Structure formats: C-alpha cells, structure tokens
From Swiss-Prot:
Organism: Apis cerana (Indian honeybee)
Record-listed Glutamine amide modification sites: Q76
Phylogenetic classification of the source organism: Eukaryota, Metazoa, Ecdysozoa, Arthropoda, Hexapoda
Full protein name: Melittin
Gene: MELT
Site keyed Important for the flexibility at the center of the helix, flexibility that is important for the stability of the voltage-gated pore: positions: P64
GO terms classed as biological process: killing of cells of another organism; monoatomic ion transport
C-alpha cells in the first residue's frame, strides 16, 4: 500500500510540474497579432461615443426627412 501511495505522489508531482511548465511557456509566448477585422471591432466597442454619434446623425438627418414625408402624405390625402 505504501508503494502505491508513493507512486501516486510521484505521478501527481510530475503532472503538477508539467502543468507549471506549460503555464510558464504560455506566459512567455508572444501574443499573436490581431486580425484587422478584430481591431476594427475592438475599436468600435471601445468607443461608445461612436455608436451614439451614429444614432444622433441618423436622428438629425433622417428625422426631419421623415417629418416632411409625413406632412406630404397628409397633404396628398
């Protein structure tokens, strides 16, 4: 029984050591370059003002056009 416990401890120690080696290799590995599409998406997500600006642009240009279209339709009957 003592032999099996020793074997289990040695096995656990080796697995733990290999896990640490892989962890450190992962930390030291250079990060891959992001794809251009991913950078554009990240920029859009990082700047919430850009989304609000787009909404405001649609409202300021589209809303008056919509109001004038509704007025024309009412005048036509």
């Amino acid at each position: 029984m003592k032999f099996l416990v020793n074997v289990a401890l040695v096995f656990y120690g080796r697995v733990h050591f290999l896990h640490l080696c892989v962890h450190f290799l992962h930390l030291w590995a250079p990060e891959p370059e992001p794809a251009p599409e991913a950078e554009a998406e990240a920029d859009a997500e990082a700047d919430p003002e850009a989304g609000i600006g787009a909404v405001l642009k649609v409202l300021t240009t589209g809303l008056p056009a919509l109001i004038s279209w509704i007025k024309r339709k009412r005048q036509q009957g």
